[in-house]
UniProtKB/Swiss-Prot annotation:
CDD domains in the cross-refs: eEF2_C_snRNP, EF2_II_snRNP, EF2_IV_snRNP, snRNP_III, Snu114p
Source species: Schizosaccharomyces pombe (strain 972 / ATCC 24843) (Fission yeast)
PANTHER family: 116 KDA U5 SMALL NUCLEAR RIBONUCLEOPROTEIN COMPONENT (PTHR42908:SF6), TRANSLATION ELONGATION FACTOR-RELATED (PTHR42908)
Taxonomic superkingdom: Eukaryota
Region (G1): 148-155
Protein name: Pre-mRNA-splicing factor cwf10
Positions of disulphide bridges: none
Compartment list: Cytoplasm; Nucleus
tr-type G domain: residues covered: 139-402
UniProt region (G2), positions on chain: 190-194
Length: 984
């Protein structure tokens, strides 16, 4: 056979089988003889023979199936799970993926960091144990906030303290440290957004060490809630003012809030170097500029209180002069000490008292005088402080190194030769640090004029705690008892999120007792009361920290007087809370909610881009509500979620956190609008009545507008509904000339205890059984507060209205006059009487403060006129080339005003807007003859109707107010008989 026939075209062998070739390929090994194979008995002992036989049987049983025919479905290609993992492992088999497509099978490792936080505790010039000992064992503690206007140097002042207490801390090149600005958005925008607590140990002029628990607060006027929250648990205010800009709009509000809460003020005049290097004022003019700013602060204080204890003045020791950018802060005493340390021979206090005011120094006679004899005398402040300061600055920025070296040697300042080669600013910072050193003058001012927590305990208790002071809890708070047996009472005013933004720390002040890690406590919410204990949760303290801005000191416990961060108690807290121990003998009471300086009048609606992510949005809204004290979230009847804030900047930061930190989803945001209120401008045209559903009770009411000023007094806390009836009566008789009967008939404020509506009982005892009426008093109050919370026009709050209860007809049986009958009826009669009293809409108005050069004033006037705004005053700023313009602008027309202002003035103008008051929108909102035109702005008297229709549409309500919803048929017939025409 030919060789090519043995293979096919693919090279496969197809020839006949050859047994010889197969034997050559696979030769058979010779079988061993019996002599060659040893017996089992020789190799294996008798005791192991049984094991070997058993192993052979198992091996044979494993090999037997290899020669059997196995079906395809019975073949085993891989070992079973039991063979791989063992028989002790539970194995589950899932044939369908239970994870959604949006969730990866293997989750990536996410490091969500929203803030700068030091993982390792940095080195300090003091031991941490020493700091904790000061906080817990002594009264050498001061708790205060650092407040002021935007970019006036609050964070820089605390940076100055951080530089000297944290030796390893160095600022970035060509930038300030901003140690308390930990949020990434704060560092990106170069402005503080959140208040940040910082705890330090510092020494005064005598070397005594104090523990400072200071809180850096934002300066932007939109974030005044971050000022009010820590102020509620602080003992004083350090007010920072730029000497060139002077007292600004936010400074004024902070002063007012501090004086109303009886808090001492320490004034820091910052950026003194700008008078020398920028304005280049002569020393005598610089003195007048400094004095003018101090007088401006005192004028604002006097408008609130005439008490001299709040006055600030350098000779009193509560005014500091600083340039935080150059690294110095001094008082008259600390500067006088620099002279005495070099020359000696005089008392510091006596010398410092002669360094301010119209006191002159005669260099020839070396004596002080109250007036200059020849007219050429120099004030002592100018001679001893400003002139050396001017020399120090001017010589440093000049290139005369030898002259500077000679001048510095007179101050006993010796620098290295390479230091003279530095740029002017670093060189000036180095020289000022060598000359002034640690700001002991600032420490002295704070420790002398801001009381310790123990000294201030009685004042804080009287202002914040609503419980009885003569109880065991009240006495413990007054004494600031630190005993372990004392009742634990803490006040939470702020929530700070963790670095990953998943949880929150509760920022609290311990008023009495001791708190320990793992302790079981009761968390009482803002709505807690002895009658309604629903807003109370039992929790365990998971973590206790001493806040230090970028790091936290974890401790096992804290005592009364300390400000601490608490972990594990935030789940039930929305804004503020009271924390008490779970085994109190007396009934616990809560601390008052925070009285803020502004209102949330700016509103947007949000929704998720992907509707399936609504749960994430709701969770994010809950977290933003915790993080921002003045934010309010609400769900309208249309289902949309609305957020209320103070302004554009506030809302921008809140929405940034909502998108990137708390929900991590894409959201859609509506155009911003303003919040409205409802009011009445006339008395009800007829007595309005409403019957209960069972037709056995009738309530009659009349509405009239409140006198001007009452609403402001209620909101500012000048009158409180919880006062005794006699005290409330005396207040209205004295301030508003109410008669005795009217002033003693006040039942409630609405919609809450600080609401600007009043419910009065004007029924006569001859017509109404007062005992029966008192049995339904609480029901009528609830209906009144419900009605004033959600008005009939567009479901907004009613404001400045006096509701007078004229007549009540009640069923004699208690079962027929229960809450289910009286509450909705009281609400209906509030609405019907309100709608017959010329109802109107009210809109919020911003106070605008613009700083700009004189040539920008015409542009500012034009921009304000386009937005229904008007100028109140424009005045020049003393000692600066700027003008100050104060104006009013409606909130709904303010969107984009700041951007337009900067564009049209090429960035020369700077403005701040803050809520000022409510004003009535022109026009009748119920006038059906007005038809809003699409795509055209409403003008004049059409505004009210336009706002009403668009607001009701947005909320999912019908366009017009329904008559049958609020008026009984009998009431409608009575209106027709009286000739009253309702435009409903």
């Amino acid at each position: 056979m030919m060789e090519e026939d043995l293979y096919d075209e693919f090279g496969n062998y197809i020839g006949p089988e050859n047994e010889e070739d197969e034997e050559e390929l696979f030769p058979q090994a010779p079988s061993p003889t019996i002599a060659q194979v040893p017996s089992f008995e020789e190799v294996i002992p008798d005791e192991e023979l049984e094991d070997v036989e058993r192993a052979e049987e198992m091996a044979l049983s494993h090999l037997e199936p290899q020669n059997a025919v196995v079906l395809h479905e019975d073949k085993q290609y891989y070992p079973s799970a039991e063979e791989v993992y063992g028989s002790n492992v539970d194995i589950m088999v899932q044939e369908q993926d239970t994870q959604p497509l949006s969730q990866p099978i293997i989750e990536p490792i996410r490091h969500k960091r929203i803030a700068i936080e030091t993982t390792n505790v940095p080195d300090t010039v003091y031991k941490k144990e020493f700091l904790f000992g000061l906080l817990t064992g002594t009264d050498d503690v001061r708790s205060f906030i650092v407040a002021g206007h935007l970019h006036h140097g609050k964070s820089a002042l605390l940076d100055l303290l951080v530089y000297y207490t944290h030796p390893d801390t160095k600022p970035p090149k060509r930038r300030s440290l901003r140690y308390t600005d930990t949020h990434y958005l704060e560092r990106e925008r170069v402005m503080s957004i959140k208040s940040t607590p910082l705890t330090l140990a510092v020494s005064d002029m005598k070397g005594k060490t104090f523990a400072f628990q200071c809180i850096d607060t934002p300066g932007h006027v939109d974030f005044v809630d971050e000022v009010a929250a820590p102020m509620a648990i602080s003992d004083g205010v350090v007010l920072v003012v730029d000497v060139i800009e002077g007292v600004m709009i936010n400074t004024t509000r902070i002063i007012k809030h501090a004086i109303l809460h009886d808090m001492p003020i320490v004034l820091v005049l910052n950026k003194v170097d700008r008078l020398i290097l920028e304005l280049r004022l002569p020393p005598n003019d610089a003195y007048h500029k400094l004095r003018h700013v101090i007088d401006e602060v005192n004028d604002n204080i006097c408008q609130i209180s005439k008490d001299l204890k709040y006055r600030v003045s350098p000779e009193l020791g509560n005014v500091c002069f600083a340039s935080c950018d150059l690294g110095y802060c001094f008082t008259l005493s600390s500067f006088a000490k620099l002279y005495i340390d070099r020359h000696g021979g005089i008392d510091v206090d006596l010398f410092s008292k002669r360094l301010w005011g119209d006191i002159y120094f005669d260099s020839k006679t070396r004596k002080f005088a109250k007036q200059s004899l020849d007219g050429s005398g120099v004030r002592s402040f100018v001679h001893f402080i400003l002139e050396p300061l001017y020399k120090l600055h001017t010589l440093t920025i000049s290139d005369e190194a030898e002259k500077l070296k000679k001048h510095l040697s007179s101050f006993q300042i010796y620098l290295k030769p390479k230091d003279y080669l530095l740029d002017p600013k670093p060189l000036l910072q180095l020289i000022c640090a060598s000359f002034f050193g640690f700001p002991v003058g600032f420490v002295n001012a704070v420790t002398r004029h801001i009381p310790s927590p123990r000294e201030n305990a009685a004042r804080k208790a009287s202002q914040s705690y609503i419980g009885p002071i003569n109880s065991s809890i009240g006495k413990a708070i007054l004494e600031m008892s630190r005993e372990e047996s004392a009742p634990l009472v803490m006040h939470v005013t702020k929530l700070y999120n963790t670095v990953d933004a998943n949880n929150f720390y509760a920022f609290a002040r311990v008023y009495s007792g001791q708190v320990k890690k793992g302790q079981k406590v009761k968390v009482l919410g803002e709505n807690y009361s002895l009658e309604d204990e629903e807003d109370m949760v039992v929790a365990h303290i998971a973590e206790i920290c001493v806040p230090c801005a970028r790091y936290r000191l974890h401790v096992d416990g804290a005592v009364a007087g300390m400000l601490v961060l608490l972990g594990g108690v935030d789940n039930s807290i929305s804004k503020t809370a009271t924390i008490v121990s779970d085994n109190l003998k007396d009934d616990p009471y809560i601390f008052r909610p925070i009285a803020h300086m502004s209102e949330s009048v700016f509103k947007v609606a949000v929704e998720p881009h992907n509707p399936s992510e609504l749960p994430k949005l709701l969770d994010g809204l809950r977290k933003t509500n915790k993080s921002y004290p003045l934010s309010i979230t609400k769900v309208e009847e249309s289902g949309e979620h609305t957020i209320f804030g103070t302004g554009e900047m506030y809302m921008d930061c809140l929405l940034y956190d909502l998108r990137t930190l708390y929900s991590e989803i894409e959201i859609r945001v509506s155009d911003p609008v303003a919040r409205f209120c409802e009011t009445a401008v006339d008395t009800s045209s007829i007595k309005c009545f409403s019957d209960t559903p069972n037709k056995k009770n009738r309530i009659t009411m009349v509405v009239e507008p409140l006198e001007k000023g009452i609403s402001n007094d209620i909101e500012n806390g000048k009158v409180n509904i919880n006062w005794p009836q006699k005290r409330i009566s005396e207040f209205f008789q004295k301030n508003y000339d109410w008669d005795l009967l009217a002033s003693r008939s006040i039942w409630a404020f609405g919609p809450d205890d600080r609401g600007t509506n009043i419910l009065r009982d004007d029924t006569l005892s001859t017509d109404v059984d007062k005992n029966v009426l008192n049995s339904v008093k609480e029901y009528i109050k609830q209906g009144f507060q419900w009605g004033t919370r959600e008005g009939p026009l567009c479901d907004e709050t009613i404001r400045n209205v006096n509701f007078r209860l004229m007549d009540v007809v009640l069923a004699p049986e208690q079962i027929y006059r229960g809450g289910g009958q009286i509450i909705p009826t009281a609400r209906r009669v509030c609405y019907s009487s309100f709608l017959t009293a010329s109802p109107r809409l009210m809109e919020p108005v911003y106070m605008v403060e613009v700083h700009a050069p004189a040539d920008s004033l015409p542009i500012i006037y034009d921009l304000l006129t386009r937005r229904r705004g008007h100028v109140l005053q424009d005045i020049p700023r003393p000692g600066s080339p700027l003008y100050l313009v104060r104006a009013l602008i409606p909130v709904i027309d303010s969107c984009g005003f700041e951007t337009d202002l900067r564009v049209h003035t090429q960035g020369q103008a700077m403005c701040q807007m803050v809520f000022d008051h409510w004003q009535v929108v022109p026009g009748d909102p119920l006038d059906k003859s007005i038809k809003p035109k699409p795509l055209e702005p409403a003008r004049g008297s059409d505004l009210a109707r336009d706002f009403l229709i668009k607001t009701r549409r947005r909320k999912g309500l019908v366009e017009d107010v329904s008559t049958t919803r609020y008026f009984d048929q009998e009431m409608i017939d009575s209106l027709k008989e009286a000739g009253v025409v309702l435009s409903l």
